[in-house]
Amino acid sequence: MCKSRTMFLAAFALCVVAAIAVRVDAQQSAPAQKDSIAFQDHVNAAKLLAADDLTGRNLLDCTMPPQSAAPTGKPVTAPPTRVFDQLYYLGTDIVASWALVTSAGIIQIDSLDNPEEAQRIIIGGYKELGLDPSQMKYLVLTHGHDDHYGGAKYLQDTYHPHVLMSTPDWDMLAKLHDSRPGFGPPPTRDMDIADGQKLTLGNTTLTFYLTPGHTPGTISFLVPVTDKGKPHLLSFWGGSALPRTLEPGAFEARATDMGLLIYKRSLERFIKIGEDGGADGFIANHPYRDQTFIDGKNDKITKNRMREPGDPSPWIGRSTYIRYMMIALECNEAQIGWIQAGKPQVSQ
């Protein structure tokens, strides 16, 4: 990508984000109205923001109706990888988990699909990376879907971390009767997360924000890390897949969706939180979203392994982070506009 185009995209993204505060004030309290911009214009904006490096599965959110961004087929296990000085990736090409090492123990983020994956990929990864599973003090679950909590009961019963999830999603899981084949049961309810709540372990503090949309109580947060001693702040958006309807619970196949309108308000709020906090990178709980692990050839784990001294981390880049978040917002706007327009047939 030419330098001038990169500079234009960065400037464009910054200008759009600067307008978020105004949009939030105007839209959070306003009734749903038909978008004044045609939904296809939002799709085009997302494609522009994607440029050459954020194309692919993230843009599937902009298809009408939206397609699943998840890869199909048997999951491929990623090599356990030290991503930053204190952050480690443990997952597959479909779902992620992260270990955040502090001066007083480990904060584990998400737990994969089931006990077998948690034991083989998370605990096996700990041991391969020289981490001690007994130092897992907290297990943070980004939301109450089984591809994120499926291994939690095993970790809870075996290593006894405190398990944290938002109050709305704990309540949602309390109504769950049966586990899906291939996925583990919910953990025993332990600690509830409220909006703005802080978790401090040793020298690390995370502040959690309730960002309903993907589920009633999806949480998002900023992760402080260092790369070879240099500090960075990563944005972690906790629920990437878009709802299918405007209002909560209207799509039977995904009854936990809170609707596109609520999702949009949460996303706008968290973008502003990231901007105010100075986020300069991002990670996700699905690796095809942040391109942490795709195929072992053209992903960030591979690029990180091939870094030369002085090269920046592939997870860091303020412009890229902003464009990633704005693609999600544009696709959300496109889906709202498409539904409000009566779901017309669209050539993809």
Task: Label each region the model flagged.
Residues 63, 67, 82-83, 120, ...:
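Metallo-beta-lactamase
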Residues 28-73, 228-231, 242-348:
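Accessory terminal helices/loops
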Residues 116, 144-150, 170-173, 216-219, ...:
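Active-site environment of divalent metal-dependent phosphoester hydrolases
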Residues 1-5:
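N-terminal secretory signal peptides that target proteins for export/translocation
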Residues 10-19:
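Bacterial N-terminal signal peptides
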Residues 32-37, 42, 48, 116-120, ...:
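Active-site HxH/HxHxD metal-binding segment of metal-dependent hydrolases
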Residues 21-28:
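Boundary at the C-terminal end of the N-terminal hydrophobic targeting segment
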Residues 73-129, 221-247:
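Conserved beta-strand hairpin/beta-sheet module of binuclear metal-dependent hydrolase folds
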